[in-house]
Amino acid sequence: MARSIWKGPFVDGYLIKKVQKLMESGKSEMIKTWSRRSTILPIFVGFTFSVHNGNKFIPVSVNEEMVGRKLGEFAPTRTFHGHGADKKIKRK
């Protein structure tokens, strides 16, 4: 079920503070975060976030198409190594 519109998008408060601080200073640093649950806001466009995937931090550079989605959607947590090979021996 989707989040109620009257509640608005969820974003951790410290993320907004970090983005505003970087906007004021004019620096383009990578913002390190564990908050995969935060929604991407329009003020995040142009910034690069390091999103934790449970093992390491994945760099995610935000563009306009990402607005409204979650940060965690762009840092996959599982790696697919392919399906197992067929172990049956084929006879001629």
Swiss-Prot record:
InterPro entries: Ribosomal_uS19, Ribosomal_uS19_bac-type, Ribosomal_uS19_CS, Ribosomal_uS19_SF
Stretch forming the signal peptide: none
Gene Ontology biological-process entries: ribosomal small subunit assembly; translation
Keyword terms of this UniProt record: Ribonucleoprotein, Ribosomal protein, RNA-binding, rRNA-binding
HAMAP family linked to this entry: Ribosomal_uS19 (MF_00531)
Function description: Protein S19 forms a complex with S13 that binds strongly to the 16S ribosomal RNA.
NCBIfam families referenced in this protein's UniProt entry, alphabetically: rpsS_bact (TIGR01050)
Stated family: Belongs to the universal ribosomal protein uS19 family.
Name of the protein described by the UniProt record: Small ribosomal subunit protein uS19
Organism: Rickettsia rickettsii (strain Sheila Smith)
Encoding gene (name): rpsS
